[in-house]
């Protein structure tokens, strides 16, 4: 069970809604993933119509919506988008994204911290997408963010946990949930994140662009479950030296 702010989730896999070939395929993949929290880019939705091709099937699916501010380049733009989302969708939950460079889509740490502090004061449950910077994540926690979402690698790159060393520090020091976001390309990446101690992962591109998104969503669900179980089982310590699992000499002495 995962608790963030005022909500609890059975699934530790969060999903996105971008890049799917159709809304129907998107919903089928989300259902196969078991995800209960789904991100939604405000710039891709017609907030005036609840029969929007993306929004309507998500509402029908009964998932918790996490609108995001993707496309915002400044704190002011992100705050404005957040206020629109709260009014239109009736939710105070928000994934805060501010990335001014369209090529790399890396989050702006200064604008993110600035916006997060303001949005928390306005009553939002803020989940900020941020770089894998332990100091920044601690500052975001201190201003009241309900979780932190450090990247594993650039958005949509499928590179995996390139920031593993920093993620380990973030996880160790955090007192709010840590959701590894961006760069997760295959289910084994997700399993590794959960084994490391992350509370959840957010996956979009890896599922949406697969030849079979529904099958890939299922694979991610199973990988996240496996990673969580492995962590709870407490793996043995790594060792520099070999350690035999069977006697090396006893059987020879018995035959002598």
Swiss-Prot record:
GO cellular component: cytoplasm
GO molecular function term, any single one: thiazole synthase activity
This protein's encoding gene: thiG
Similarity field: Belongs to the ThiG family.
Residues the entry annotates as binding 1-deoxy-D-xylulose 5-phosphate: 156, 182-183, 204-205
Pfam families listed in its UniProt record: ThiG
Record protein name field: Thiazole synthase
Function: Catalyzes the rearrangement of 1-deoxy-D-xylulose 5-phosphate (DXP) to produce the thiazole phosphate moiety of thiamine. Sulfur is provided by the thiocarboxylate moiety of the carrier protein ThiS. In vitro, sulfur can be provided by H(2)S.
Pathway: Cofactor biosynthesis; thiamine diphosphate biosynthesis
Xref: InterPro entries: Aldolase_TIM, Thiazole_synthase_ThiG, ThiG
Bridged cysteine pairs (disulfide): none
Reaction equations catalysed: [ThiS sulfur-carrier protein]-C-terminal-Gly-aminoethanethioate + 2-iminoacetate + 1-deoxy-D-xylulose 5-phosphate = [ThiS sulfur-carrier protein]-C-terminal Gly-Gly + 2-[(2R,5Z)-2-carboxy-4-methylthiazol-5(2H)-ylidene]ethyl phosphate + 2 H2O + H(+)
Domain of life according to the entry: Bacteria
Enzyme class: transferase
Assembly notes: Homotetramer. Forms heterodimers with either ThiH or ThiS.
Active site location: 95 (schiff-base intermediate with dxp)
Keywords: Cytoplasm, Schiff base, Thiamine biosynthesis, Transferase
EC number assigned by the record: 2.8.1.10
Compartment annotation: Cytoplasm
Annotated GO biological process: thiamine diphosphate biosynthetic process
């Amino acid at each position: 069970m995962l608790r963030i702010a005022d909500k609890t989730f059975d699934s530790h896999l969060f999903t996105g809604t971008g890049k799917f070939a159709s809304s129907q395929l998107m919903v089928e993949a989300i259902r196969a993933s078991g995800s209960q929290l789904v991100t939604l880019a405000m710039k891709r939705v017609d907030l005036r119509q609840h029969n929007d091709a993306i929004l309507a099937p998500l509402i029908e699916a009964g998932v918790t919506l996490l609108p995001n501010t993707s496309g915002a380049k400044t704190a002011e733009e992100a705050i404005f988008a957040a206020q629109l989302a709260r009014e239109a969708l009736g939710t105070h939950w928000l994934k805060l994204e501010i990335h001014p460079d369209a090529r790399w889509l890396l989050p702006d740490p200064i604008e993110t911290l600035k916006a997060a502090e303001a949005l928390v004061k306005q009553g939002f449950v803020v989940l900020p997408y941020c770089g894998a910077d332990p100091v920044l994540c601690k500052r975001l926690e201190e201003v009241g963010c309900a979780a932190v979402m450090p990247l594993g690698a650039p958005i949509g790159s499928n590179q995996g946990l390139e920031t593993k060393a920093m993620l380990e520090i973030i996880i160790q020091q955090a007192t709010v949930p840590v959701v590894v976001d961006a760069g997760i390309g295959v289910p084994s990446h997700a399993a590794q994140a959960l084994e490391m101690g992350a509370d959840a992962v957010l996956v979009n591109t890896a599922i949406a662009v697969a030849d079979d998104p529904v099958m890939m969503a299922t694979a991610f669900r199973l990988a996240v479950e496996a990673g969580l179980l492995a962590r709870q089982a407490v793996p043995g310590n790594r060792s520099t030296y070999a350690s035999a699992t069977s006697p090396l000499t006893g059987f020879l002495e018995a035959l002598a």
